[in-house]
Amino acid sequence: MGQMEATDVRVGVLGCGNVGAALVTLVDEQSGVVSERTGISLEVAAIAVRNTSVDRGVECSADVFTTDAEAVVNDPSIDVVVEVMGGIEPARQLVLAALSLGKPVVTANKELLAAHGEELYVAAEGAGVDLLFEAAVAGAIPIMRPLRESLAGEPLTRVMGIVNGTTNFILSRMSDHGASYADALSEAQDLGYAESDPTADVEGFDAGAKAAVIASLAFGARVVPADVYHEGISGVTVEDIEAARTMGHCIKLLAVAERGTSVDGEVEIGVRVHPTLVPFDHPLAAVNDSFNAVFVEGGAVGELMFYGRGAGGRPTASAVFGDLIDAAGNLRRGHGAPIGALSDVRIAPIGDIKSAYYLSIEVDDRPGVLSDVAAVFGGHDVSIKSMEQVGLGAEAQLRFITHLARESDLQETLRGLGELDAVRSIGSVLRVIGD
């Protein structure tokens, strides 16, 4: 059988930082293999950067680089546009312009998708071309394509995952080496995992943007970052991690998107990011250091987990490269795989969310205290699953894991506990993956 004739596809790349440079290198290294397997010959024909005098470490002639991103998008010889510049503007306008010209777009920009995803999805559908973004949520982990395609007809109930490598590295160091939060963060910064200002990572904003994208795709719902409840890891202590360990759990920062039913019977979506106690026998408990994983639960498929490197120039570029090949192939075949408009679905307020909880309280160690504490739990419909007492002389620390309870009921329980004379202080309160 003769070899198929290759179709030339000229690519314009917007941005050439770590991911962009790694992508250009991958195209150079793998173009021969791609051509043999798919019949598509990829060529990076233009790269838009802020400063053309900076050495990007890629094998490209100087005339490929330009500071005019609009010219790259509008160039009629450019077939596919790859956006890896980051930020919302001018990335949004450039992506919309490319789509309006009938050019498929590949992006790794989670902030853009989280804030303006539906606008871009509708534009891509109207143009009949691809908008692909596998790299936007979990680096090299292929989760977007399964949600868009393989699981499109699956009645998904929950998608949750470790989608921020920085916080997972910090929590792993605290767990495995007993490092304090401050020391683990400093090490992450020294290794380049954390920015000098780590707020977006450690306070859950980065994971929140990714959770919005995941929820939108998993449930076809209109979800933006403002809909996502988030707590970070800056308040997690080594003592919390050790207490969790004694109760058979580790602590992970999880992004959770789940479909449920409101008290009045309407479908609702809960989307949140927070530190979570994960049982040691759960697959997510084995995801350590800077690795990411996404755990999917569905009515028919059961449970699936996608695992891999969630950050880094080359792993992320690998996902972009895969999208680029798909976009080029669909362009040759004359069709795209648009997402289109999203549905209005009620976003559950955090008070309505049900979860299991871990909490610790310091109490006077005297008769009758435990029964008083248990009465407060019961009075607010919060059922205790397990309890551990650690003696501290005249004081004792009580550690509880509850069964599923409504967040609002848990908050009322905390207020009730705070009113007991025997309760000296309320310590950590963390959610638990539980029944």
Label each PLM-derived region with a short phrase.
Residues 90-101, 110-148:
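Rossmann-fold NAD(P)-binding glycine/threonine-rich loop
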Residues 183-286, 291-293:
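Substrate-binding/catalytic subdomain of NAD(P)-dependent oxidoreductase enzymes
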Residues 125-206, 213:
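Rossmann-like NAD(P)H-binding beta-loop-alpha module
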Residues 5, 281-356:
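ATP-dependent carboxylate/acyl-activation modules
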